Amino acid sequence: MKKLLAVLVIIGVAAGTAAAGQPPQKQEKQQAQGKVYIPKEVKEPMMAGQAARQARLDIPFSIFKNLFLPAQQAQQAILFFKAKNADLGFAAAVAPQIADATDAAQPKMHARLNLFLQFHTVENGQPVKLIKEIFVPATLEADQAGYDPEAEAWYTIGYPLMPGNYLASLAIASQDLKKIGIQYYELSLPDAKSFTQALDTTPVFFMKGLKQEAAPELTPLLHKGLFAYSVLKITPSIDHVFKVGDALDTFFYIYGVQPKDGGKYDIAIDFEVYEGEKLAIKFAPGAFDNPLVSLPLQLKQTLLIKKGDEERTETRDLPAGDYTFVIKVEDKVSGLKGEKKVPFKVV
């Protein structure tokens, strides 16, 4: 199943794009032709606040992280932001008249917003060249029953960019453009060809959910509680907090590995879990023929139990505590190595 997942993602990346359906070079040409329009009520404050990263909080929100994954020759940049329901303007939806009350659907709350996103290249900490402007109309939905205006949710939007350093300017606006929230976020996307001395990976995350679609998205869309990558809809763990008995469903891509003559890879990976400096779990070494790794790891310890002169082994769930997940990667073709550490918590 996991090998199939890796193949599906690689096919999706090679044959299409992870978000926009066409390479960044073509998108830049369309930008030059003026096919994306940001109204001046939004664009002027976006541009004015870029140099000092001066946020505008008519609609409060915050960009709190980004991920990136390979997309053709580019990198799929994924921005994560969070906002309260009340700040996004949720209101009761007008339901159609239904003759039979038994057919009535659960009443909904809707929020209709316009998102505008700019990417500028960055030199010496300052935005230099506008690479892309994106407009994303969005309608969010929530059940009216149990709706909490103070509840905070997280959202994502992704776009493929060539390697480099960027400033993302994200504006969220009401439909009448009278309320506008603006935030700025700097991100760096690596060049896969630059890893010649050591291996590295994309940011490692742990999956909580996965859904495969029939085709990748042709235009960027706003997603709540998940992100889109090729034909996949992935729900990652945001806080890296797991319950006793949960698995670490890890997902990452390895940079710097070289294929063999037949096109496949020869990658050795050791996975370990540490509690402080103490080794808590050492998983069996893994051999991989693809640089994209998606693998569930059961958080179970094999313990040696001594009672008098008797000894026995017992398998137990990893107990509650703070841990570090360690990934040690070696490319058997080039000899290059790399290591990644990710903190997580079991409760």
PLM region spans:
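Bacterial N-terminal signal peptides
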Residues: A6-A15
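Positively charged n-region of N-terminal signal peptides that target proteins for export
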Residues: M1-L4
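Intrinsically disordered, low-complexity terminal regions enriched in Ser/Thr/Pro/Gly
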Residues: G21-V347
